[in-house]
Amino acid sequence: ALIHDWFLSESFGGAEKVTQILDEYISKNFSEPDIFSLTENITNSRNNIFNRRKINTSFIQKLPFGKSNVQKYLPFIPFAIEQFDLRKYDLILSSSHIAAKGILSSPDQLHISYVHTPMRYAWDQMNTYIDHSNFKKYGLEIPLRYLLFKLREWDYISGSRPDYLIANSKFTSRRIKKYWGLESDIIHPPV
């Protein structure tokens, strides 16, 4: 199984390209992996990296604006990623900048996670995220801070779920060590 946080045409960047390369490599050398993502909204052919294959999505896909603005459902992302049933797979590869590394696997499965960053919203960019949200304007800064505190806890716990962590850079490896207390190997992205 291959899992990535989400696929959106308007925010198609390096993490998505890495996932595409992983898919191409696995498909060429083994068989096409089943693909999972919280949401998918690939609307143009340039970004249709999976040749119109089915992408298994979470319940967030069906919520209003879930396909196009998954961040609106930030409080539900940990729950949503944990709902994927991946029991039939021996190998799980996750490409994660928020949640994909948090999928639930069994001791009989190998989970390798290529980490682009620990959850920025919850760690060093928390105050920037708060400043750019409308929560302050509506007097909801304290509830937002509490939510981010809970997301930080989940990010810390879920960081230890993969059997093997790969960081995309020395900087990301340092962030993994600082925020999760874990070691990671570094493999620079081929993009």
Cite the ranges covered by each PLM segment:
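Short amphipathic alpha-helix
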Residues: 15-26
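Active-site donor-binding segments of glycosyltransferases and PAPS-dependent sulfotransferases
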Residues: 25, 29-101
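Active-site proximal beta-strand in glycosyltransferases
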Residues: 91-94, 105-136, 185
